[in-house]
Amino acid sequence: MLKILRNFLPFQAIGDKPLSRILNYLDIFGLFQSDPFGYPLLLKRVVIFVAGWPTYWRLAVANKLTIEGGNYLKELPNTNVLFISNHQTYFADVITFYHIFSAAKWGMFRKLYPFYLFSPRAKTFYVAARETMKSGFIPKLFALAGAIMVDRSWRAKGENVQRDVDTSAADNVQKGLNYGWVVTFPQGTTTAYAPIRKGTAHLIKDNNPVVVPVVIDGFRRAFNKTGLTYKKRNTNLKVRFKQPIYFDKDQPLEEIVAMVTKIIEQNVPENIAEWKAEAENLNS
């Protein structure tokens, strides 16, 4: 019970302003707190509350959501936790994480009972492409819930590009880790078996977080690419959390990339690898 109650305690205010610190000590509900990016936690909770009801229906009523390994969330610290997951839709994946994390705050680790939306976990962030989060009203609304927006150096507007790496991304992810939990999709795309980007390995080496591998399935069948429109209802959705791990800070980047690829089960199956090799031979 005490472990659950600690999830409702406010964190120490960020910043040196005396007024900010005084308000924090008096504010047991976190009404005056803001995250490291300046967004009030109250606003984030309102966004999660508003978006949570219709998305709960989509996940747990119109479809069948199964959560495995939720007990691993029990012993996690409140900060410096990095969730790494494969990616199937733009928004349905991360919305599901918000539901699960908010339920875990209330001590629920296997099923979703949406009363947690009255006090959701607001100290959660997710890494997302800036162009995706700026593409309309709904993405902009979701961004307020905790998006750490980055400019992808390899892809823009659906096309492959080459541009300078967004150097601010690592600093912003570090801010998120210092304040709470961060979800990242290390492939940077919803394409299955896409290669893992080295940026994730750099984040792990630089911040030494608790890394929680996650494997999701069924979202691509249930929703369209954005995750906002149904493709097939009554689909089995699965979110499987694996045992948290620490990486050795001295591990080479290539080794971390290989391990991440394996633990989120994104190694290319042999039959697909053979088909790709045959196609390349035919085109050469």
Residue map of PLM features:
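A transmembrane-helix-recognition feature enriched in membrane-embedded lipid enzymes
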Residues: 3-68, 96, 136-145
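A mid-sequence interfacial segment
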Residues: 134-137, 141, 269, 273, ...
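Soluble catalytic domains of membrane acyltransferases
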Residues: 61-251
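Residue-level preference for long, well-ordered alpha-helices that form the structural scaffold
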Residues: 43, 47, 162-165, 253-256
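Well-ordered, non-membrane alpha-helical segments in soluble/globular domains
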Residues: 49, 166-170, 260
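Electropositive, surface-exposed helix/loop patches at the edges of structured domains
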Residues: 190-192, 243-279
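Charge-rich, solvent-exposed alpha-helical interaction surfaces
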Residues: 4-7, 154, 259, 263
